[in-house]
Each structure stands twice: as C-alpha cells, then as structure tokens.
Amino acid sequence: MAKRRSSPKKPSSSPARRRKTAKKAAKKPRYTARTADKHTLYQLSVQAPELDAKIYARWFEKYTGRPLRSLREDFCGTAVLACHHVKRHPENTALGVDLDGPTLAWGKQHNVDTLLNDEQKSRLTLLQQNVLDVREPQADCILALNFSYSVFHDRGALGAYVRNCFASLKPGGMLFADAWGGPDVLKRKVDKTKKGGFTYEWDQHKYDPISHRIECRIHFSFPDGTRKNSAFVYDWRLWTLAELRELFADAGFEDVHVLWEGTDHANGGGNGVFKRKEVGDMDEAWIAIVVGRKPDTGSGTGRAAKASRGRAGKRK
C-alpha cells in the first residue's frame, strides 16, 4: 500500500509559493534558535488557516445548505483559523477556546491585532477556558483539529467533550474532528520536513500499546546548526475511528461518518482530497475527518443523513 504522511500537519500554501519562500530563505536564512518564535514556526509548519477556513465553510454549506456564520474553534491555540473565518464575511463570528493563556496572548498580538481590523475584532472572542465548560454562545460549527482532543485519555472524558459539543451547537450544526492512525504512527521515529529557512521535525517519541498513549514532540532545526528541541510536547491517546464514531453517535449526532484522505501516488503522501468512505484503506499511515451533525429541531435522523450521504470533500 502507498505510504502516507504520519505527521499531524495540514496542507501548506501553493507549490509556487513554497518554492518562492525556499528560494528567499536560501539567500539569507531568516531563523535561528535564538531569534525564531516557536508559534511562528508551528503555524508555518502545521497550519494552513486561510485554506482551512475556506474548506470547512464550503463543507458546512454542502452539508446544511446554508452558509457557515458562527464558528467555534476548540483548542484554538493562536486562533489563526478563527481570525481567517472572521475575515471571510462581514456576518461571520468566531469563538476560540484554549486553556493556555500565553498562547492565546501570543495569538492576540501576532494574529488578531495584525490580521483583523477593529470591526472584525469585535466579531471574535477568545476564551481561556476548559472546552468542557463552554456551551454559549451556540455555534453553527465546531472544529476540533490537529488531534487536540487526544488530550482526553479515557472514554469518559472524551465522551463528555463530544456531548458538550453537541449541546453547544445550534440545531443542524456540525462537528468536525480530524484523526490519524495506521501502523506507521506506532513506530518510534522522527520525520523531517524542510521549510523556508528551517526544518520541522515530528518526533513520535514513545508509545504504550496497553493504554494507547503516545508522546509526540516537535523540534525545529536551523541552517546555522542551532535547534529548538521539544518546542512542543504532546501526551495523547490514539483514538480509533471506530471509537470516535461511536462517541459521536452516543452523544446524539446523526449521519456520523468519515471523510478519508486520498493518496498522492507521486510521493506516497496525502493528496488533500477527502471523500466519504465506509471502509478505509490498509495504509501505513492515514489522515481522516470524523463528521457529525446535530439534528434539526423537529427532524428525524433520516433527512440530514440523506442530504449529506455520498458527498465528497476537498482541501485543495
């Protein structure tokens, strides 16, 4: 089977832009361990917020028949995706929730204050709070991305989170949660990806097959030989797609299904195209998105299921 990426990263900008960035970096490296900010490096390595905001808005409208206006980004970190959602339309609002105060403060200074004007800022709210404790205001859509819900290590805790998402959504609202897996993610290994002026290193550091706990780390290395070791450290549980689907259904979501990423046969990595599948491929590593919809008020489970069945999603 084709081997896919095992690193939890999202598609970056266009190939032309990547080549341009790399060319500039080759002339004069921008980053060293002393000067580089880890959040900047993370956003350049892992996130594609403008693209994600566009894609999830498109998926939401395909599933529901209405535009995505109110978004909640759980585990939002620097809230860059929420910022881009607010920028997309003058009626868009966003709520970003994260426990880490310094990360939220960094996001406000470097993302909110630089990407948004005063009117747009008025439509964005950032909360330093536990995602289990936030229910208001209800949102059209909740995103739980970059596998951050994996901080919940037992079924009871993750189930409580999914139930809270259900209660926090408006009728007909959507929950999207990305997931990763495959035999390759269980191996102790370090994947290195060159970026413009630095190298992103995804370290699958430790895995316990009994608890399904995995420790992952992100390191950054630079052309001058310096490094930022363990810039980010994650203590996660690897949740299976079957477990996630069951928890979504138990919480009350309807038409719970999986969008499975296809393979780029030229390089064996993910191709950024997600399609609904009932049976996954036996790939060494894979990326997928679990989708659930809260029933419309007064509607049964059949109507929304029929409306969304068979639709495909693209992230490119």
Regions found by a protein language model. Name each.
Residues 107-108:
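Conserved SAM-binding loop
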Residues 176-247:
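SAM-dependent methyltransferase
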Residues 115-131:
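Conserved SAM-binding strand-loop segment of SAM-dependent methyltransferases
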Residues 78-91:
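Conserved SAM-binding loop of SAM-dependent methyltransferases across substrates and taxa
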Residues 238-316:
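C-terminal lobe and adjacent flexible extensions of AdoMet/dcAdoMet transferase-like proteins
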Residues 67-77:
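Conserved class I S-adenosyl-L-methionine
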Residues 158-171:
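A short glycine-rich, Lys/Arg-flanked "PGG" loop and its adjoining helix->strand segment in the class I
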Residues 132-142:
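A short acidic, Gly/Pro-enriched loop at the edge of an enzyme's catalytic core
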